[in-house]
């Protein structure tokens, strides 16, 4: 079953234009496109299915099958039927994922609901083109749900005058995504710059590291949790992050990747 975006939107890069080190690479060959799609499927990479190019509302899905003969791409169906119906009515999805730490973008047309292995799934035409983007700061990882990283913003105060604390959904060396309380009217607004934000990165039972950073709010969207609750999702970009802090974040990302690989090995995937 598809998981709605309760965590990483590996999809929105917080890298600045100056961070782009390699040109975009468009793939237009059908065999090569299928090769990449199969790689994404075998890697079990999550895909963000956007309802529109400028939308921050997305369903996290995955590729279930690639059928070159029928020219069809089969993807996991969403958990939220309202979003599913909007997508089916539009017949179009903007798909963003990552493969081997490279951002992949493609469009899905002729979207339909089908039955696949006894359950609902999305069917779409195999895309005519696929874009690969290599960005230095793009690669994001999902933070732990059971032991989440948190960001304390001292310049914001809750009703009890305590600094506001947000949980992180994901993090990269270029930015992070925060989540607010369900149905909250978040205090954060797009374009706002906040200084002296403390980010606590947890370890195994203790604090892995803590850094201070200035951030700019890139966007404020929404995320639908598995339980159906809607929460504000805040995309943040680091401003002039010190090299020491960047290295700490990179080590934390490496640690999370090692934990994920260990779980995959133990579970037999």
Curated annotation (Swiss-Prot):
InterPro entries hit by this protein: PilZ_domain, Split_barrel_FMN-bd, T3SS_YcgR, T3SS_YcgR_PilZN
Coiled-coil residues: none
Positions of the PilZ domain: 134-254
Listed GO biological process terms: bacterial-type flagellum-dependent cell motility; regulation of bacterial-type flagellum-dependent cell motility by regulation of motor speed
Pfam family, one: PilZ
Gene Ontology molecular function terms on file: cyclic-di-GMP binding
Protein keywords: Bacterial flagellum, c-di-GMP, Nucleotide-binding
Cited Gene3D superfamilies: Electron Transport, Fmn-binding Protein, Chain A, predicted glycosyltransferase like domains
Subcellular location: Bacterial flagellum basal body
Main location: other
GO cellular component, one term: bacterial-type flagellum basal body
Known function: Acts as a flagellar brake, regulating swimming and swarming in a bis-(3'-5') cyclic diguanylic acid (c-di-GMP)-dependent manner. Binds 1 c-di-GMP dimer per subunit. Increasing levels of c-di-GMP lead to decreased motility.
Family according to the record: Belongs to the YcgR family.
Subunit text: Monomer. Interacts with the flagellar basal bodies.
Protein name: Flagellar brake protein YcgR
Species, as recorded: Nitrosomonas eutropha (strain DSM 101675 / C91 / Nm57)
Name of the encoding gene: ycgR
């Amino acid at each position: 079953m598809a998981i709605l975006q309760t965590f990483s939107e590996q999809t929105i890069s917080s890298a600045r234009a100056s961070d782009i080190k390699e040109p975009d690479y468009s793939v237009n060959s059908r065999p090569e496109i299928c090769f990449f799609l199969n790689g994404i499927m075998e890697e079990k990479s999550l895909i963000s299915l956007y309802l529109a190019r400028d939308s921050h509302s997305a369903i996290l899905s995955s590729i279930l099958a690639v059928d070159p003969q029928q020219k069809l791409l089969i993807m996991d169906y969403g958990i939220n039927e309202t979003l599913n119906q909007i997508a089916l009515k539009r017949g179009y999805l903007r798909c963003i994922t990552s493969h081997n730490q490279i951002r992949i973008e493609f469009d899905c047309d002729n979207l339909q609901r089908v039955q696949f292995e006894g359950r609902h799934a999305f069917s779409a035409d195999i895309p005519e083109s696929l874009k690969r983007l290599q960005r230095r700061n793009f690669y994001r990882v999902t933070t732990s749900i059971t032991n989440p990283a948190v960001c304390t913003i001292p310049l914001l105060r809750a009703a009890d005058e305590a600094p506001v604390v947000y949980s992180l959904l994901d993090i990269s060396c270029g930015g992070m995504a925060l989540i607010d309380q369900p149905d909250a009217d978040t205090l954060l607004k797009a374009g706002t710059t906040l200084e002296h934000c403390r980010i606590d990165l947890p370890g195994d039972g203790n604090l892995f590291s803590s850094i201070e950073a200035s951030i700019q709010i890139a966007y404020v969207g929404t995320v639908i949790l598995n339980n159906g609750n809607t929460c504000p999702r805040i995309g943040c970009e680091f401003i002039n992050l010190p090299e020491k802090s960047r290295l700490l974040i990179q080590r934390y990302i490496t640690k999370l990747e090692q934990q994920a690989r260990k779980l995959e090995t133990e579970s037999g995937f």
